[in-house]
Design a protein with these regions (language model features):
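Short connector loops at helix/strand junctions that flank enzyme active sites
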Residues: 29, 44-48, 66-68, 73, ...
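Glycine- and acidic-residue-biased ligand/ion/polar-headgroup-sensing regions
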Residues: 55, 64-83
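Short acidic-glycine-tyrosine-enriched beta hairpin
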Residues: 83-100
Length: 126
């Protein structure tokens, strides 16, 4: 399957403005999509986005995705429940999650900014 994502050459990204509330209505969490052809109905494609948690944000419960997810923390701190542990992570930390892996809830006293990569494996990749 050929990607629908456009070719993007290096360009400046505003890491402060232009964020939108996350689609599920989670308060205090906003996103800026950098590139995406992720189609959760057809279970294909990929997405790259910035994800911001405002200071004092917390999510109520654990969740899982049916796609791969990689997160790299750029700034701030976040407390996350994962793999039976509670961890506080900061800048230059990284997570990679296979489809179906439970994670969360999360919270951030200071606020944080992450880059989030999500994708479905194609039939040829499995």
């Amino acid at each position: 399957m050929r990607s629908e994502r456009p070719n993007l050459f290096f360009h400046a990204i505003d890491a402060f403005g232009g964020f939108e509330p996350r689609g599920d209505g989670a308060p205090g969490i906003s996103i800026k999509v950098l590139s995406s052809d992720l189609d959760t109905d057809r279970k294909r494609g990929s997405r790259t986005r910035l994800l911001r948690l405002n200071p004092g944000t917390s999510t109520p419960e654990a969740h899982a995705h049916d796609y791969w997810e990689e997160i790299y923390m750029l700034e701030g701190e976040m407390t996350v429940h994962e793999d039976g542990q509670v961890k506080t992570v900061g800048p230059h930390t990284y997570a990679a999650r296979k489809p179906g892996v439970m994670h969360g809830p999360v919270s951030s006293k200071t606020g944080c900014l992450m880059i989030d990569f999500c994708w479905y494996e194609s039939g040829e990749d499995k």
